[in-house]
């Protein structure tokens, strides 16, 4: 069976981030889902410091090698964000790109105690549509009530 990937919107993700970076003079990025580091290579490699989370050990090790000046955490970003991890840097650019819904990650960041810059740019990829298209809505917490009432297959109609 082929490996599951969600890079159908990569060029749009990259374009959004490149444009959004222009909104901040000295960006300090927090990337909540580092993945394989492809967006970093295209958008953030010129930045000396930042924060990235990745829960898979093989990926987090690669991210640490890729960005030696960054704080790289092998952790579930929701729990880490709630605990204030990454608060040692004045993050002013938040990049949220989960495979699924972004809402729990955004809640964790904004509910945490951390320094708040005068200006914060937030870029978000919401994978919910892709989850619904592939009949995976049952995985998404925010869809649970609807899945219980309507079933999984009827959540996305083309």
Language-model-detected regions and their locations in the chain:
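Short, conserved active-site loop motifs that form the nucleotide-linked donor/cofactor pocket
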Residues: 69-71, 120
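Acidic/glycine-enriched edge-of-secondary-structure segments
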Residues: 2, 64, 69, 148-154
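S-adenosyl-L-methionine
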Residues: 1-62, 66, 77
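Cofactor-binding loops of NAD(P)H-dependent oxidoreductases
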Residues: 73-75, 96
């Amino acid at each position: 069976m082929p490996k599951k990937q969600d890079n159908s919107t990569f060029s749009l993700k990259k374009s959004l981030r490149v444009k959004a970076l222009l909104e901040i003079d000295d960006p300090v990025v927090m990337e909540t889902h580092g993945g394989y580091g492809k967006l970093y290579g295209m958008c953030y490699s010129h930045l000396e410091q930042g924060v990235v989370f990745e829960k898979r050990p093989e990926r987090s090790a690669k991210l640490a090698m890729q960005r030696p000046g960054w704080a790289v955490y092998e952790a579930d970003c929701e729990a880490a964000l709630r605990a204030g991890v990454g608060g040692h840097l004045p993050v002013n650019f938040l990049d949220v790109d989960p495979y699924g819904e972004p809402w729990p990650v955004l809640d964790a960041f904004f509910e945490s105690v951390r320094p708040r810059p005068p200006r914060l740019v937030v870029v978000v990829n919401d994978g919910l549509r892709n989850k619904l298209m592939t009949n995976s809505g049952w995985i998404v917490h925010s869809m649970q009530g609807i899945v219980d009432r309507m079933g999984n297959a009827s959540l996305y109609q083309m």
